[in-house]
């Protein structure tokens, strides 16, 4: 997860969406077409979907998963596991190549050092909690920050979804700098209507968006973010794809240039009561299992 502070806090919230862990067990779809009743209210559907996302974030679940993150500097792949004390992560590949023995040793040493550094571990946990709280505030704002227009239905990855176009609500008064980014953004939402779950958010800045009357910084027109969600295991929904393209300025001189694509896969359920240390051990066991399989040529 990319984290920024101060003038770029709104961007940090958008980035945090991919790892917010918006997952919830919901009944599997029966394959029926989306049911759109006469007098369908797009705003109300968004409100229901947002309520489900917030509820899902408070759910009792944990997953292990893999994230491939691509930036202009290259590609890094990490294995993650949710624990009751935060999300633990371990680097497993660079530029789609397995780590060298030296790199593996360095990564193991980093994890061990983190476990033995209580102050750093608490700082990491505090940061993750603050990121999650910012995400929740932003998600709660969606029904009021935009006006929504029904554009039809479509099928995406086997899901029948409703497409809603959104544009800023002129009556919306952003309660903080974080929400100011919504005043210059339009795009579309895809919502699975039976379960009222957000399947995709695609937003683009149609104008420069300033923070603190432009004194603290701004994001440039044309910036875009995409977040894709879907059921991944036993009906659980979570983020599977995220794409970010933003430029701007912070505090007059510091440039903001974020070009990131993340794809998450290999989801599986793990116990919800794992400690951070147990999560790290699980990551190590997973890594050792992959190495053993590779050394045996994939034979069981």
Task: Go through the PLM ranges and name each one.
Residues 9-21:
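Bacterial N-terminal signal peptides
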Residues 8-9, 74:
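Intrinsically disordered, low-complexity segments enriched in polar/charged small residues
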Residues 25-186, 193-199, 204-223, 231-236, ...:
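Structured extracytoplasmic
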Residues 226-228, 239-241:
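Beta-strand elements of repeat-based all-beta scaffolds
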Residues 1-4:
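N-terminal secretory signal peptides that target proteins for export/translocation
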């Amino acid at each position: 997860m990319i984290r920024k502070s101060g003038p770029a806090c709104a961007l940090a919230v958008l980035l945090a969406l991919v790892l917010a862990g918006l997952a919830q067990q919901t009944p599997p779809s029966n394959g029926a077409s989306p049911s759109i009743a006469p007098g369908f209210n797009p705003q109300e559907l968004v409100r229901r979907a947002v309520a489900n996302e917030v509820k899902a974030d408070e759910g009792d679940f944990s997953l292990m998963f893999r994230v491939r993150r691509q930036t202009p500097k290259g590609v890094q792949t990490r294995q993650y596991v949710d624990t009751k004390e935060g999300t633990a992560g371990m680097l497993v590949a660079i530029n789609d190549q397995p780590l060298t023995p030296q790199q593996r040793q360095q990564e193991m040493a980093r994890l061990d050092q983190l476990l033995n550094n209580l102050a750093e571990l608490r700082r990491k946990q505090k940061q993750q909690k603050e990121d999650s709280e910012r995400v929740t505030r932003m998600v709660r704002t969606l029904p009021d920050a935009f006006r929504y227009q029904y554009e039809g239905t479509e099928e995406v990855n086997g899901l029948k979804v409703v497409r809603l176009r959104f544009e800023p609500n002129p009556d919306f008064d952003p309660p903080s700098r974080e929400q100011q980014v919504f005043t210059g953004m339009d795009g579309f939402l895809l919502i699975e209507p039976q379960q009222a779950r957000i399947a995709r958010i695609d937003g683009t800045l149609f104008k420069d968006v300033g923070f603190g009357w432009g004194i603290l910084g701004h994001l440039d027109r044309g910036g875009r973010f995409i977040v894709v969600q879907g059921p991944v295991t036993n009906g659980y929904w979570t983020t599977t794809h995220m794409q970010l393209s933003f430029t701007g300025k912070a505090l007059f001189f510091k440039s903001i240039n974020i070009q990131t694509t993340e794809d998450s896969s290999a989801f599986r359920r793990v116990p919800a009561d794992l400690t951070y240390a147990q999560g790290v051990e699980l990551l190590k066991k997973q890594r050792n299992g992959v190495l053993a399989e590779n050394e045996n040529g994939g034979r069981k």
